[in-house]
Swiss-Prot record:
Gene it is expressed from: hspa14
Role summary: Component of the ribosome-associated complex (RAC), a complex involved in folding or maintaining nascent polypeptides in a folding-competent state.
Protein's UniProt name: Heat shock 70 kDa protein 14
Sorted UniProt keywords: ATP-binding, Chaperone, Cytoplasm, Nucleotide-binding
Organism the protein comes from: Xenopus tropicalis
GO cellular component, one term: cytosol
Amino acid sequence: MAAIGVHLGCTCACVAVYKDGRADVVANDAGDRVTPAVVGFLEKETIVGLAAKQSRVRNATNTIVKVKQILGRSYGDPHTQKHISESKCIVVEKVGKPKYEIDTGETQKFVSSEDVAKLIFSKMKETAQSALGSDVNDVVITVPFDFGESQKKALGEAATAAGFSILRMIHEPSAALLAYGIGQESPTGKSNVLVYKLGGTSLSVTVIEVNSGIYRVLATSTYDDIGGICFTEALAQHLASEFQRTYKQDIRGNARAMMKLMNSADVAKHALSTLGSSNCFVDSLYDGIDFDCNVSRARFELICSSLFNQCIDPIKKLLEQIGFKANDVNQVVLCGGSARIPKLQQLIKDLFPEVEMLSSIPPDEVIPVGAAIQAGILIGKENLSTDLDTITIECSASDILVKETDESGDNKFTVLLPSGTPLPARRQHVLQAPGHISSVCLELYESGGKSPVESKFAQIVLKDLQKKASGVHDILTVLTMKRDGSLHITCTDKDSGKSEMITVEETP
């Protein structure tokens, strides 16, 4: 039985298959190994991938892009509001959740982000089944390290709705290390690996300590203001300037023309990762004018010089945060489509001149390859050359906190499980509640990444406690997080022995 791994990114999706002792990304029906994470709604059909991306110029308000940005988020979430401001689609609020308003003329409907993600997962399932010639259900799915519980739940629900049975969700940096087998070569050795991921809409940098086969995240940071699309936009602006210089027409305010330029710039950007120059041709760009412009790699690098600086600074900041110097890093792993850019690779190499930089697996394929290897391990049908399962231990992605009331009556947050804790893990904490009350509500929050805002994701209520004339209730709280990220919380009144337990599932 084959095993598959799926990576759903903000701009692209990719599926890899583990079979006969190796993991490989498989091509879709268009012959491409990476599929645009774009869904278009037409009068008679729904299209996914390249066809949807190409038809967006004519069908912008019914074509959904970057859906991962709002998966599992509320309508009022700042990420959702940013997505809405950038979207060509109409997004409305339904019961506190964002939904896309689709109007093809034939029908009008409201589509959730989970529905859109389901269609992309279905495309990945079809791609894998076409390559294998048989049905496939079991899958490992990758998630960003800073994904919250609600986001993971939404991602899991979308995959399940597409017909997948989720074996496990693993963090993207862990999948990247698995793809290169990092940790298996010297299972008793210790090393530090920097995982650099430049995706379509964000940049993340993670430093992982590999020790005795265990991954431990030392630090991670994510930046949502820089991504591959920024390079595309910069090149599109340059092309618009060239058009104005040649034809004395400023098209920057014309949404349709700029979308055409964005498509051409995106193709050129990818080509310039392997070629010295690329030709940008747009048929009938504006007012019937065909636009033709050649862009060299050197010109592209000059246009994007400030963006390259933005992409390198986060590495320096993260190393400074954990007190590392460049020579404290043993390996650098490149992930994400824009990590293919030669100039960026050179700048990273300049930062780590003595460090091995791993890019033999295409950066936009390394994460799904690692996920497929993990799937192969879990299914256990393949004869693996090494015991890779010894290095698949995950870490908690965010701080898990409990809200308490201090002596002054003010709320305070106590960290029960710090981010980066190797899983599985078990922690306990004694919560004190006023003796005159007969019930205690324990609220759990998560806080991760750079945001200081805690997010409540669960609560547990302990009822029918014996009231006390004086003193406090001592409530023993035990939190257990399994390797798959599921949380099991038990609260016990130490006096009466009354107990309640809840489980917050990471995967369906």
